[in-house]
């Protein structure tokens, strides 16, 4: 985010928290004060990451309470509609640039959703460069490439064209 802010000659306030669910992202933005000319860039999380009773988790978690949640309470259709509602809600109040972690998540969105997502994916930049010494994270060049691509998408208003389908 700071690389992009530098490129756009803006100051940067990064309020992200790794592992946040889309519900938590929505709550953080809604409870923060924003100026009318603020540039808000939202990196939405994985569709199935959720927050329940104040705890964050993903479907892949092996804890018993998490498995119970996904077995008994979770519905991918309901979750996609909830996500679309949160994105549209924020975008109806603020001018936002939306980013999605995975293009497959965009194919699951509700047909009534009006918000757009920039046509840039982190995974595309990540694939172009080797991993850092830890073997898990990409090297700095991947971040620079992503910031440059993101900047071009904002300047050119390049949004992902969703192949809509009913969910």
What are these regions (language model features)?
Residues 30-167:
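Alpha-helical cap/lid subdomain in secreted, periplasmic
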Residues 1-23, 33-34, 145, 153:
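Serine-esterase "nucleophile elbow" of acetyl-processing enzymes
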Residues 21-25, 48-51:
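Short active-site-adjacent helix-start/loop capping segments
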């Amino acid at each position: 985010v700071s690389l992009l802010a530098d490129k756009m000659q803006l100051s940067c306030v990064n309020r992200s928290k790794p592992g946040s669910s889309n519900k938590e992202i929505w709550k953080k933005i809604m409870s923060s004060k924003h100026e009318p000319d603020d540039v808000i860039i939202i990196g939405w999380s994985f569709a199935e990451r959720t927050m329940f009773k104040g705890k964050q988790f993903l479907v892949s978690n092996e804890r018993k309470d998490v498995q119970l949640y996904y077995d008994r309470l979770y519905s991918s259709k309901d979750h996609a509609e909830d996500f679309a509602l949160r994105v549209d809600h924020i975008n109806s109040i603020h001018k936002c640039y939306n980013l999605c972690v995975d293009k497959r998540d965009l194919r699951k969105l509700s047909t009534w959703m009006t918000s757009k997502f920039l046509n840039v994916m982190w995974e595309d930049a990540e694939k172009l460069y080797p991993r850092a010494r830890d073997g898990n994270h990409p090297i700095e060049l991947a971040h620079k490439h992503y910031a440059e691509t993101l900047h071009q998408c904002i300047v050119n208003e390049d949004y992902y064209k969703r192949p809509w389908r009913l969910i």
